[in-house]
Amino acid sequence: MRRIAIKLSALAQDGLTYGADAYDLDRYRQLSQLAAELFSAVSGRPAEELAVELGRDSGYATPKVDVRGAIFDDAKRVLLMRERTDGRWSLPGGWADPGDSPSSAVTREILEETGYHSSAVKLIACWDREIQQNPPPLPVHVYKLFFLCRPDGTVQPPAALETLDVGWFAMDGLPPLSLGRVNHRQLERALAHHLDPALPTEFD
């Protein structure tokens, strides 16, 4: 039902972007409201709140892009940052900004959230957030790009706005994860690519 709501929302957004007839535009606005109500039934969030969130986008509806950067040290520990929003831990990352290439987006996020200067050396995976079962359900379709990155040795204080803490963790001693951003399987796949860079990029 969530996928139906997302598809209805995308159709409404496209219609509001390219439609010209006043009656059609009104129907597309009604369709957008129905999509918000349907997603509300799935997620438990208020339909009014979802309608505002869905109405922020304009133009042809496309998936949003989330980038995540995995950095490992010689002891196979992974660099994680503690999210201010939920107090849990994640690979550094976030929404890609317009004007950023995927690799520059992920290295910018790593710098802002951990203080580490780095370079992206490999695309680990392009995953569909829903297929990967990253909770909670969102009212938009999301592609998640995971990169293997390498620090260049330069470190500065991270941006306090988003980050509570930064740390290195062994895979058998991971802290509570912010599962909407990264799950255990995704970290395991990132480590596999760190250990064997010849592995092919994964995708859904």
Feature-to-residue mapping (PLM):
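Nudix hydrolase/Nudix homology domain
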Residues: 1-30, 34, 88, 156, ...
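N-terminal strand-loop-strand
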Residues: 51-90, 118, 122
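Juxtamembrane/interface motifs at transmembrane-helix termini
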Residues: 45-49, 100, 196-197
